[in-house]
Amino acid sequence: MSSNPQHLSGNEIRTRFLDFYAQRGHQILASASLVPEDPTVLLTIAGMLPFKPIFLGQRTPEFKRATTSQKCIRTNDIENVGRTKRHQTFFEMLGNFSFGDYFKEQAIAWGWEISTEVFGLPKERLVVSVFEEDDEAYAIWRDQIGVTEARIKRMGADDNFWVSGPTGPCGPCSEIYYDFHPERGDDNIDLEDDTRFIEFYNLVFMQYNRDASGNLTPLQNKNIDTGMGLERITQILQRVPNNYETDLIFPIIETAAKIAGIDYHSSDESTKVSLKVIGDHVRSVVHMIADEIRASNVGRGYVLRRLIRRVVRHGRLIGISGEFINQVAETAIALSESAYPNVRQRETVIKAELEREEANFLKTLDRGEKLLAEIIAEVKKQGKTVISGKDAFTLYDTHGFPLELTQEIAEENNLTVDVEGFQKQMEIQQQGGRGAHETIDLTVQGSLDKLAEHIHATEFIGYSQATATAKVEVLLVDGVVQEEAEAGTEVQIVLDETPFYAESGGQIGDRGYISGDGIVVQVEDVKKESDFFVHFGRIERGTLRVGDNVTAQIDRAGRRRAQANHTATHLLQAALKTIVDGGISQAGSLVSFDRLRFDFNSPRGLTVEEIQQVEEQINTWIAEAHSAKIELLPLAEAKARGAVAMFGEKYGDEVRVIDFPGVSMELCGGTHVSNTAEIGVFKIISEAGVASGVRRIEAVSGLAVLDYLNVRDKVVKDLSDRFKVKPEELPERITTLQNELRTTEKQLETLKGQLAIAKSDSLLQTADTCGDYKIIVAQLEGVDPESLKSAAERLLQKIGNGAVVLGSVPEADKVSLVAAFSPEVNKKGLQAGKFIGAIAKICGGGGGGRPNLAQAGGRDASKLPAALEQAQSELKSALG
């Protein structure tokens, strides 16, 4: 056999793997979604994850053997992407699985056969590892396969023993490595040496069950779980130095390089890293969006947003200044569509999401990078090596600049970020935004923790009762335990049982009264601390003492309004999923007495028609009078029935399910109406974005709708009187005014451009001549960026062969720069994007663009003359 493996494309490798196992009785299954069935798992991170319920005995398999090519995403080592040969966020895992059928001997034999016979890997280049106690696997490799003992390495449990958790199925594994340098011999083989070895096939033998004591018992039905990294085996067969230069990824890299006007192979290492990051991350985001993940600030949505932002920033690092991600995404889609047709089918959605996120982040990046550059310069000037947590938090809180991006840029400048200080600033802000009750909560919790061993948890009876006879267990004033308190005192009270709902799940706490013999306490809020319901209120009359028997009574009217609004949020989520997008998920909510608020993950706002349809659907459900079915169910059963759970929420083994059959089913501990008809009517007040990828709907229900409409009527009447038109004529009148304003603005912009061009024409007389080139470097007063760009293009057209660099200060503390180079100047090694980006740094800014035309900005207008002087000097030096 030849000393080198045969050359195959990535698609051919995938097909040959699946066909090999299909011919041996395996069912070929399509890749599962990157969104796992288990809501507690963020993303599909391994080929075996879709089969985990089978391995854990929770589901009976429909077949004994299966083979897949599974899409996976891992971001735990994201900082290593592009810097090592094999770290990626997106990868495909080829796998063959046996559920109680064949086991170790057959799995090893087939693993060796496909590696050596199908893929043609030379046997002398393969090394295998086994678990140090797995004598059976060792013997199979040595005696049946014929691997020499020098090339069988025993490894510890950390490397070669798979577990599903603290208890459950587990077993040893065996890995096959490819040796790039067999000439180094078999003495002292070190499989950790990634310059020589790459592990490409892992065979897991699930043969034990581990109990709570750590004891291993042989399983009656043993399973096989294997994984061959497609990118790794492709690197080996295509004989390239890393995974990125395989035909699975490199075409994406080439597209990015072409947009940037650079060549990958002749680029420096930092540029190659950026190109690799783009190549990898674009694969990830294309498949994530195709699997209906949308960018947001939580969960897998934030993973998507972070990856998109890293693509944009690394594009900037290689000189791409504008939007480019969809050009690169098109290459990724084309590479994937034969194996994963859904990426082409969802192309429009993918590109719309990427375009929106890229445009939004470019604005954030412009502001944040400029400010961070100033911070870094100041830190270095002071001889420090750490960016303060306060500065990092200001970037995050005020300008939306992500902490991890600050850390990444800091690392590039040999600095670190005080993350602990950042977290402290976050805590300070969160505490500063709380009301008086929340500020006291910390003291209350401390006091209750001390008393927890001596008093019982509060019994909540508010689902079925509005009044309770109770005993005062704990009395606090400003969080400090007291035996009694007099009229006029703000108090916190813990009762042994209560009908008051404590703030939870977005629903505010009940209001009402606690009364007794000569005592009246007005309760304004209720919060839950551990197992205790804390009633915040004011003693209106009498003296309250620990041990008093009292009557606790909620404000029934307020409760009715709150529970109507809470049920309305459930109907709202159901309507959004039905009408707008089944992938919509809750990102937060507020249920109060007078209104409701619902935050949800969505890449776009709702259209007027969609808002109307959502309203109509909810009001239809209200009119249909659907009765509630409320049950306590095991969590697994509730999920199996399709109950909606909020991602990231921790649930117990038993959950409360609010079910309006045929309409909505959610896990929820809040209070609700018994029939949708009790809501009365529902009206959406507003729909808007509150964060990138997060939308917010505010709405009212019941009598609050009438209050809202009365206010609207008054506003319409006032506008009608002001414009002296009928209410129905208002839209037309406003449109007319808007059109007139736009016309005026366009005329103004045209005049600005004409003025800039007129100013620039006078510069032709001042052009310097350097050999065959003409150079114009000048400052124009008060010219906006677009007009400045037009002036530079016009000047270059007139001088022909040469370079034009213009600067201006269009407004206070804002510098605008533009460079326009002829093709002959480009041939001298000068690129406008890189050139103007470097010049802009003098003004505390940055930028870039194409080799022939690029724009940049800055914040220090006083440095513009120096920047232009530097530009003049560098151009003369390069072209003279």
From Swiss-Prot:
User: Sorted alphabetically, which InterPro entries does this protein's record hold?
Assistant: aa-tRNA-synth_II/BPL/LPL, Ala-tRNA-lgiase_IIc, Ala-tRNA-ligase_IIc_anticod-bd, Ala-tRNA-synth_IIc_core, Ala-tRNA-synth_IIc_N, Ala-tRNA_ligase, Ala_tRNA_ligase_euk/bac, DHHA1_dom
MF terms (GO), sorted A to Z: alanine-tRNA ligase activity; aminoacyl-tRNA deacylase activity; ATP binding; tRNA binding; zinc ion binding
Q: SUPFAM superfamilies, per this entry?
A: Class II aaRS and biotin synthetases, Putative anticodon-binding domain of alanyl-tRNA synthetase (AlaRS), ThrRS/AlaRS common domain, Translation proteins
Whether Nucleotide-binding counts among this entry's keywords is yes
Q: Name a single GO cellular component.
A: cytosol
**What enzyme class is recorded for this protein?**
ligase
Cofactor binding notes = Binds 1 zinc ion per subunit.
Q: Name one GO biological process term.
A: alanyl-tRNA aminoacylation
Keywords of the record, alphabetical order, are:
Aminoacyl-tRNA synthetase, ATP-binding, Cytoplasm, Ligase, Metal-binding, Nucleotide-binding, Protein biosynthesis, RNA-binding, tRNA-binding, Zinc
Q: Does the keyword Mitochondrion apply?
A: no
Reaction it catalyzes: tRNA(Ala) + L-alanine + ATP = L-alanyl-tRNA(Ala) + AMP + diphosphate
Q: Where in the cell does this protein reside?
A: Cytoplasm
Family the UniProt entry places it in: Belongs to the class-II aminoacyl-tRNA synthetase family.
Looking up HAMAP family in the UniProt record yields: Ala_tRNA_synth_B (MF_00036_B)
Recorded protein name is Alanine--tRNA ligase
- Gene name on record? alaS
